[in-house]
Amino acid sequence: MKMETLKQQILTAKGDVRAELVLKNARVINVFTNEIEQADVAICQGIILGVGHYTGETELDLQGKYVCPGLVDGHIHIESSMLCGPAFEQAVLPHGTTAVVTDPHEISNVAGTAGLDFMLETTKDLALSVYFMLPSCVPATGLDESGAVLEAEQLRPYYQQPRVLGLAELMNSYGTVRADEKIMQKIRDCTAAGKKIDGHAPFLSGEELNAYVTAGVQSDHECSDIHEAMEKLRRGQYIMVREGTAAQNMDSLLPLFREPYCSRCMLVTDDKHPGDLLQGGHIDYIIRKAIAAGVDPVVAVRMGTLVPCQYFGLAHSGAVAPGYTADLIVLSDLEQFTVEQVYKNGKLVAQQGKMLHPAALAVDKARFARVFDSFNMDEITPEQLQLKQTGTRQRVICLTPHSLLTTEKIVPFCQHPGTAPGVDVAQKIVKLAVFERHHRSGHVGLGFLGNYGLQCGAVASSIAHDSHNLIVAGTNDADMVLAGNTVRKNKGGLAFALNGQVVGELPLPVAGLMSTESAEAVEEKLQALKAALKAHGISEDIDAFMTLAFVSLPVIPRLRLNTYGIVDVDAQQIVPAVF
């Protein structure tokens, strides 16, 4: 900073020079002292220079409205919104989110460093600050078949990027606590760069948790009960309280929303569908929900602002105080957390739920050919769905409402007219398949899914964490083939087939994960699909696509299905579907 600039800032803060912008007569949410101050907020050149009594070149009388720091999502996968950067910004910035920390491991699993470069390129000029954690597990484990493999040497150069804050969720906790050499190399590089390492270790406890933290893992977003969260807090980790589309853990973790725990806890969404962002909100939604549950509003705000900024080392961000970046939101109502205005670097960027100057997606498709042409598989045939009956019992992967966890259920092998062998609609058991789509290997994993609720037809999705192969669930093979081939034809997306007809589809041509359309356009097609599926039995407490997308992730207990077959996550072994 030039000496003259600093001098002007000091004189403005002192009140000797008029500020560029003053938000007058505000109620300022102070996240340092947990109080609300009656004051003006003085802003110059994107920086807050004072909280007190000020005059400005431009003055805005807030008439007692609240001024709050801009909200920060400490852990999200933008790709899970199905939106590219500009459309994602339009969905979250009007809700008061001024910064996100994203882990682009979805697109990196499909397209490797080309996917990472795509995300960096398409978010660099947004008003929304988009920071990155480098994908640590591409693929998630050795028992997965991704489109790319990212080792330490591929990640190392990215630590020089100013928007890269560290190494993203170490999902392979099994390998981490056993000092796997490749994981150790990634940890070493991140530590040498002075950056953060995020965790992902559901139910890790005792000595293994000690080993995980010793490795340098400083946070966790997978806690689903208070006892797990407390143990991790005691071992020095920060807790990311997750409230997303599929995984909703806030209610179980409400005891953390008070001292002394709240200073080590932050709010995150992890994965959010576009409709939830547009209608319910983003971090503002979690704060509203917490306040409704009896949480002190200022504590909830602190967990969505200052705490993530302190954790990630985002200096001079996350508070309304002198010297802090003027990323601010104006609230008309604190209890309802109603966002009226959003300021980014002191400039008004959103008002009454709309961005003032939305950005458009501008990208060289030729440069990112691997991103826009990500399907490398042959047409699906009925023969690929043939499951050999090698026994009298079948293993069912059972979904858990409002959770990513699954359970195991063993039932007698069944055959009913009009459905594929093993399908029992009355018992909510459907057939499940995962087709490899990156290397034309022809690998197919087959199994059974419980509690999904589908009564007829088939659902297909190229969003299938984390390797994002093609996952299909259905009651009969013919519709499964049709739904899967529809997604293949569209180079990615979602589809629902019924009685030999495609009832609905949502193309996602960007790595098979994202659309180039607006959030509203994507949501309209998504809701039409969800409505059709709901009419055909999908369980009320299951998100038809978000929940299905996690069924193939072999790092969350208990059972998963990928291109190799059914994975016992705890044992990290393939187990038979029929035995």
Q: Where are these predicted regions, by residue range?
A:
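Histidine/acidic residue-rich metal-binding segments in metalloenzymes
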Residues: 149-169, 175-240, 247-268, 278-292, ...
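Divalent-metal coordination cores built from histidine and acidic residues
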Residues: 2-12, 89-194, 260, 503-507
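Short acidic, glycine/serine/threonine-rich loops at helix termini
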Residues: 111-115, 141-147, 178-182, 208-212, ...
